[in-house]
């Protein structure tokens, strides 16, 4: 999309824990990490190997007649397949057997044993495969939350969303494009909960979403073996350029009591944020008691108060000050 400011995600090589914590993590910005050892999976996780090791255990997958997943209109269904059959279908362009159409797309986001209570953990759900994947030790073991297996058909695009925990996306096989947007640009993304309504980020409907052009677009291409550090609250949209296998590793970077204890997916807002949003809804209900012009006026006052009280103020550097005064 040419009308958006486009920025490259910085790339680092041969990063160890010390370098990550000193030079990358404090910036709270995405970073591509190359040549970080993640185990033999980059070499061994072929379609045949995955099918053999994963076997016929059943997995619940997304099936869509088109590669761009649409959470607004739910253009996908959930179906259960043996893992080896799923792998075979996800890797092929045309399917002799199918649910919707012969060119349907598949997407797996692995779940815990009891999806309502347990987070996904590659070591528990796929122990035969987990031994080939080494979790980068960029955080303390007690901070670990989940390791999520992600497998996509070629061309599959997942909608723009944010997560409330820091995470590393390990691209094991295939290439993937990732587009990210800063939390500061949330006002331009037309959010419904944790997701952006702008599904086609490459050719958006600017009559429907005119503010979207103001969002700065960070973009990178992940190669097999690459890691992408995605800080919490950064919006991201993924496009599988090839059949792809990856692992998302999430960890708690806030105190454990900040998170909803009944959230096995790790995507619920922090407890305090949830309370604040609930209070906001009650406040908006009170504003509805006012005539429209008064409601508009006091809503604007409230926005100003939130900006002055809660927004992070960025320091103005000397060069910017001089340019502003000349």
From Swiss-Prot:
SMART domains in alphabetical order: JmjC (SM00558)
This enzyme's EC code(s): 1.14.11.42
Cofactor binding comment, as recorded: Binds 1 Fe(2+) ion per subunit.
Protein's pathway: tRNA modification; wybutosine-tRNA(Phe) biosynthesis
Catalytic activity of the protein: 7-[(3S)-3-amino-3-carboxypropyl]wyosine(37) in tRNA(Phe) + 2-oxoglutarate + O2 = 7-(2-hydroxy-3-amino-3-carboxypropyl)wyosine(37) in tRNA(Phe) + succinate + CO2
InterPro entries hit by this protein: Cupin_8, JmjC_dom
Cofactors named for this entry: Fe(2+)
Name of the protein in its database record: tRNA wybutosine-synthesizing protein 5
Organism of origin: Danio rerio
